[in-house]
Amino acid sequence: MANFTTENELEDILHQMGHHIHDKNQFATFKNEIDNLLDRELCLSDADEDVMNESLFASLSVDPAAQFIRQERNFPTENLNIQSPIVSRKRQGKRFIYENVELQSDFDDESSNEYPERNLLVDRAWRSIHRAMETCNGATETLKSISLDGSDIQERSSVDDEENIAESVSVGLSTETEQSELQKSSRPEKEVWTRNVLSLEPGRAPKKYDPVTRYHFYKSEWDRHPAPGEMRRLSLRWKVREFMLRHDVPRLNENNEDWKANHDKDWSPRPYID
């Protein structure tokens, strides 16, 4: 068995790939496997053609030597006639219709027969792009329908508001307050501070927040449900006071002088001590 690589070359290649083999026996086994693989490939190859020198991109028609390899291997070209990937888009109402258009190819028959894989790869690429465009168009149509529904609801609510205002002016202040309360209760609270986006763009939300309306809504809720303040702290103080008064406080005897400190050092500010 011939040695195709040395240990230093193989170790450098492993180091470049990010692998490290510290065990010598394991490294020797790995080198023997690599030599066996290369020897097997050399035996399977022909005398005039070396498999190891063959390009990896020959099957993708990227390498210039691909046409010579296909001619030598007699590639079948009869079953590789593919459909034209060119697609036309026509508008029908709110939707688009895609149709395949058969156009005259810019390449002659000889070039198409020489590169059949190229047409196959281009067709696959165009089909994947076509599926991606259909997905994007479906998403945009959904967003447009949502925005149209939201605008219709907003127009209906504005018309209802005008009718309610006219009725309240004709009837009186009492009916106006009742209608405003009913109107507030009928609207969902989660959509009070949201408004529809006028110019809808793909990938953007169909609605956005109105900070002024949201602030007034929160302010009204805060006024209705104020945070606990002095009453909670006062109850906590009473609990602490009750806990401290469970034990009797020791009384101080004025005649007892044990608590006074005896200073051995003669302090200079004597009046301060007296």
Curated annotation (Swiss-Prot):
Keywords: Cell projection, Cilium biogenesis/degradation, Cytoplasm, Cytoskeleton, Phosphoprotein. Residues 171-183 have a biased composition (Polar residues). It is found in: Cytoplasm, Cytoskeleton, Microtubule organizing center, Centrosome, Centriole; Cell projection, Cilium. Disruption phenotype: Embryos do not show centriole duplication defects, are viable, and develop into fertile adults, but only 10% of the normal number of ciliated neurons are observed. Residues 156-188, 255-274 are annotated as: Disordered. GO terms for biological process: cilium assembly; foraging behavior. It comes from the Eukaryota. The keyword Membrane does not apply. One of its GO terms (cellular component) is cytoplasm. Residues 257-274 have a biased composition (Basic and acidic residues). InterPro entries: Centriolar_ciliogenesis_assoc (IPR052319), HYLS1_C_dom (IPR027918). Pfam families: HYLS1_C. Interacts with sas-4; leading to its localization into newly forming centrioles. Belongs to the HYLS1 family. Plays an important role in ciliogenesis. This is Centriolar and ciliogenesis-associated protein hyls-1. It comes from Caenorhabditis elegans. The lineage of its organism: Eukaryota, Metazoa, Ecdysozoa, Nematoda, Chromadorea. The gene is hyls-1.
